[in-house]
Amino acid sequence: MEKIIIDESQFMRTISRISHEIIEKHQNLNDLVIVGIKRRGAEIADLIKRKINELSGQSLPSIDLDITFYRDDLEYVEPASQSPVYSGASEFISVQNKTVILIDDVLFTGRTIRAALDALVDFGRAAKVELVIFVDRGHRELPIRADYVGKNVPTSRSEKVQVRTMKFDGCYEVALISK
């Protein structure tokens, strides 16, 4: 069974709200770098980057981060007959002494974010990393907490939260899927 918990209108309002929060927290946007975790986190990062540009007139540097080889659960993610494919980052941007705005679609156990933090070290030593999560569903296994949250959605472990984006799904919405 599937229930739409965020429709397109709410999706775009959430992007706008998070963008406003980032601007309000940082008077100087010059030291910010936007990092989106591939795949849907990167698309959400692009939406936030464009909204910040629209609101502030400032275009922030950004990269799409592939965390494939930093994961601790590859044997569970990839089929046994298939080797993982690493696509790398979209480009190299140094994050040395910058504030990184790390963006992903869903925060669940925290393991994806841990992998992203490990991958981020390859781009330099950031002054600070702030985490943006579109949907926080709880059930953390690691001590990770988001600085900006689009929506908190309490779930059972058997439920699934699916953030759908235009590039991958042809729409902007969030679905709660019960088994």
UniProtKB/Swiss-Prot annotation:
Named from the GO MF annotations, one term is: uracil phosphoribosyltransferase activity
Gene Ontology biological process terms, A to Z: regulation of DNA-templated transcription
Lineage: superkingdom: Bacteria
Q: Where is this motif: PRPP-binding?
A: 100-112
Could you list this entry's UniProt keywords, alphabetically sorted: Glycosyltransferase, Transcription, Transcription regulation, Transferase
Write down the chemical reaction(s) this protein catalyses.
Answer: UMP + diphosphate = 5-phospho-alpha-D-ribose 1-diphosphate + uracil
- InterPro entries (UniProt xref): PRibTrfase_dom (IPR000836), PRTase-like (IPR029057), PyrR (IPR023050), PyrR_bifunctional (IPR050137)
Q: What is its EC number?
A: 2.4.2.9
One short Pfam family name for this protein? Answer: Pribosyltran
Looking up Gene3D superfamilies in the UniProt record yields:
3.40.50.2020
Known function = Regulates the transcription of the pyrimidine nucleotide (pyr) operon in response to exogenous pyrimidines.
Tell me its family: Belongs to the purine/pyrimidine phosphoribosyltransferase family. PyrR subfamily.
Quote the protein name from its UniProt record. Bifunctional protein PyrR
Can you name the source organism? Answer: Mannheimia succiniciproducens (strain KCTC 0769BP / MBEL55E)
* Gene, per the UniProt record: pyrR
